[in-house]
Amino acid sequence: MEPTITIENIVASTRLAEDFDLQKLLDTGLKGAVYNKNKFPGLVYRIENPKAAFLIFASGKVVCTGTKNVENSRIALFNLANELNSIGYKGIYLKPEIHVQNVVASANLRTSLNLNAVLSAFGVENVEYEPEVFPGLVYKLADPRVVVLVFRTGKLVITGGKCPEDCEEGLRIIKTQLDNLGLLY
């Protein structure tokens, strides 16, 4: 059975205004928002539908994280723009341009791996493996530009993609390489 990708998190960003007065946002009705400029320069705000968290910065930029697909990131950011507009905040861009910054996915090869053998077979050019520091092997692919964390259990974490297809291609590449080297049992 072929391993499948599970999208764990999408990080997307946009600009929703020229700037924000974060204290004013907090005071005017973003219920549940948290802002402590001494600890973090942004306001943190969460919504439930779709489930997402936002980092809202004084520069007008917003980072959305926690969604499981790109469409939900778009919906969450549009919902935030509409909510800011509805509480009376002026100058909100209601049709923001959204940029996916990172896609994090997981997969399971359903077999255990000898990471020392993987390191030997892959070479050290794009691979880091220091089990006394981190239990996973870190494999950096050039195209697509993703990082695959490989664990001895056969579980993978793929990060750095700009779209889900980057993560799928990263999985295909590493599975093919492991298979061709006889490292999948």
From Swiss-Prot:
NCBIfam families: PRK00394.2-4. This is TATA-box-binding protein 2. Gene3D superfamilies: TATA-Binding Protein. One of its GO terms (biological process) is DNA-templated transcription initiation. InterPro entries: TBP, TBP_CS, TBP_dom_sf. It holds the Pfam family TBP. PANTHER family: TATA-BOX BINDING PROTEIN. GO terms for molecular function: DNA binding; DNA-binding transcription factor activity; general transcription initiation factor activity. General factor that plays a role in the activation of archaeal genes transcribed by RNA polymerase. Binds specifically to the TATA box promoter element which lies close to the position of transcription initiation. It comes from Methanosarcina acetivorans (strain ATCC 35395 / DSM 2834 / JCM 12185 / C2A). PROSITE patterns: TFIID. It comes from the Archaea. Belongs to the TBP family. The lineage of its organism: Archaea, Methanobacteriati, Methanobacteriota, Stenosarchaea group, Methanomicrobia. HAMAP family: TATA_bind_prot_arch. Sequence repeats lie at residues 7-84, 100-178. Keywords: DNA-binding, Repeat, Transcription, Transcription regulation.
